Amino acid sequence: MGRKWNNIKEKKAQKDKNTSRIYAKFGKEIYVAAKSGEPDPESNQALRLTLERAKTYSVPNHIIEKAIEKAKGSGEENYDELRYEGFGPSGSMIIVDALTDNVNRTASDVRSAFGKNGGNMGVSGSVAYMFEYTAVFGIEDKSADDILESLMEQDIDVRDVIDENGLTIVYAEPDQFAQVQDALRETGVDTFKVAEFEMLPQTDIELSAEDQETFETLVEALEDLDDVQNVFHNVDLK
């Protein structure tokens, strides 16, 4: 799982550098989650999970509150969750998740980003079967052995617990996100470096320096699109 964690860490670092963009994306996601049910995280599981994820990116309270208030009031925007799949250089695979109020615009933008940067879009299912939807937590100051022992005592099953570059990483089933996070808090975890849903590749590939440069340009072009929430891939970024 080490390479997978390296990619998650790299993506997190890039998002942390682009605060205005990540805040805008979370503002939209919080609004959609709040509109999907009660605008209260105590009774709206989707909203609660979105807010927990937002905390790891230090999304300011005023952005969170504005999105929730908008959902409570006159917010009329309706968003569709979309997934696009495609390929980059040398067999690299990419998944693009979007949240949009204009499906045609987003499809055109994503297709253009692929086409102009050495990639091409595939059909639905052409890539996703090579990835696993996973809940991922990154924790400081707790060893993997201590975390695993505590989870076992609480009868909580997870996919894996590893030590990686000074952090303990927990991989779990996505539908157990809240249960696992609550159990981790029972172990004394107050702050999560990462608390996120990821599409993790079953296998990673390495690219030549030239192909990796092309690939990174492609991923950046996709991530820069306003409607794109997440980009996942199977490249080991060295």
UniProtKB/Swiss-Prot annotation:
**Coiled-coil regions listed in the entry:** none
| TM stretches of this protein | none
What are the record's GO terms for cellular component? cytosol
Highest taxon in the source lineage: Bacteria
* Alphabetized UniProt keyword annotations: Cytoplasm, DNA-binding, Transcription, Transcription regulation
Q: Tell me, what is an example of a GO biological process annotation in this record?
A: regulation of DNA-templated transcription
Q: Name one Pfam family in it.
A: Transcrip_reg
In Gene Ontology terms, what is one molecular function of this protein? DNA binding
Predominant place of localization: cytoplasm
**Record's keyword annotation contains Glycoprotein:** no
* Intracellular or extracellular location(s): Cytoplasm
Task: Write down the InterPro entries for this protein, in alphabetical order.
Answer: Integrase-like_N, TACO1_YebC-like_2nd/3rd_dom, TACO1_YebC_N, Transcrip_reg_TACO1-like, Transcrip_reg_TACO1-like_dom3, Transcrip_reg_TACO1_YeeN, YebC-like
Could you tell me which HAMAP family the record lists for this protein? Answer: Transcrip_reg_TACO1 (MF_00693), Transcrip_reg_TACO1_YeeN (MF_00918)
* The family this protein is said to belong to: Belongs to the TACO1 family. YeeN subfamily.
The record ties this protein, via PANTHER family, to: TRANSLATIONAL ACTIVATOR OF CYTOCHROME C OXIDASE 1 (PTHR12532:SF0)
Could you tell me which NCBIfam families the record lists for this protein?
PRK00110.1, PRK12378.1, YebC/PmpR family DNA-binding transcriptional regulator
Supply the name of the protein: Probable transcriptional regulatory protein SSP2054
- Species of origin reads Staphylococcus saprophyticus subsp. saprophyticus (strain ATCC 15305 / DSM 20229 / NCIMB 8711 / NCTC 7292 / S-41)
